[in-house]
Amino acid sequence: METPPQTTRARLRGELLDDADIYHHVSELMQPLLLCYDSLVACNMYDIANDELSNIIRRVACFGLELLKLDIRQESGRHADVLAAITDYLKLGNYHDWDESQRQTFLLNELNNPRPLLPRQLYATADAPINAEPVKEVLATFNMLAQQPAGALGAYVISMAKQPSDVLAVMLLQKEAEVPHPMRVVPLFETLADLDNAPACLDALLSIAWFDILP
């Protein structure tokens, strides 16, 4: 169940791997284990079947391939910076200058829109906000999330969350990156003012009809 050293080194170098012998889903590992167990039981070899093999099956059932789920954490302002760069590129204005109502309207419209927010090929100067390294870093994080298998990811934690738009922003960026198994979004209210406003913020989020269609 350990990753071969050569596989780890290749991944660190960013090399493409022949993944034919790599498990991608827990069922791929569980199936042969259960087959072994059933075969041992059929041969009346109960002591062997119910010893170490049973322990391995329980561990796989509990922890999967990943052993634990990975949480992602990012500050709300970084998401706002990305959306400001996007709205600048699309010539829609400056997201930073919009009030909460304008932000929610924009975010919900895009969440409900089947088309991508950005074209796949960007035509922008090197010094354009959309090409800023902090913006590209956040977008790269979401693109990385889209490549992860189901069950590998836990929660996307937003530090310094303040308003409903902070949560909607992360949902939109997941949609834009085509994350196949969107992470649940957890706003973290940290200042006293934000903590006082947290109940109203959550009530506002839950009152949005778009949330009714979420699984």
Q: What are the residue ranges of the model-derived segments?
A:
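Conserved alpha/beta-domain cores
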Residues: D38, I57-V60, K69-D71, P114-P215
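Extended, charge-enriched "interface" segments that sit outside catalytic cores
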Residues: M1-Q147
